[in-house]
Amino acid sequence: MSVISATNREKIFDPESGELLHEVIRPLSMTSSITTVRREDFSDPSEFLQAAIIEIPPNHSFAPHVHLERERTFTNLRAQETWVVMSGRVEVTFYTDKGVLISKAILEAGDLSISFKGGHGYKTMTSDALVYEFKSGPYEGQEIDKVFIKID
């Protein structure tokens, strides 16, 4: 069984504020011999959406557990979104909160994008494009969740 042994991370910042808006993560290499659990976190602990990659050796188990319900307070919470490309190719465009295009990337199988802030758009490039999408909720409808960026 092959596992990911390293990742290539492209962080995309707001050119005005320097704030991290988006990230593209790609697997770099694969190895068939892993002996210990290794974890690479992609999100700052303060972000609502947490993402990581975990390398797991054969026959390793994680103890069954339940995550505790607790009161949390978030202010000015926006939806954060991740796309994981399972097959095919997808072009992703990244924007600032003001709708300024700041970067583009081609995602292939195994790649993922995270949008913490700012805007994004996706365009499939192959007929076999299949993605997983994860976003923070609760989802209250398009009218409340997003505003579309005008593209010239």
Regions found by a protein language model. Name each.
Residues A52, H60-A63, G88-F94, L112:
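Short beta-strand segments in beta-sandwich/barrel cores
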Residues G121-D152:
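Double-stranded beta-helix
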Residues P57-P58, L77-Y95:
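Glycine- and acidic-residue-biased ligand/ion/polar-headgroup-sensing regions
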Residues I53-R78:
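Conserved short histidine dyad/triad with adjacent acidic residue
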Residues P64, V92-T93, S113-S115, H120-T126, ...:
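Short beta-strand His + acidic residue motifs that chelate non-heme Fe in jelly-roll/DSBH
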Residues T96-K117:
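Short acidic-glycine-tyrosine-enriched beta hairpin
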Residues M1-P57, I151:
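A short, N-terminal "cap"/entry segment at the start of jelly-roll beta-barrel domains
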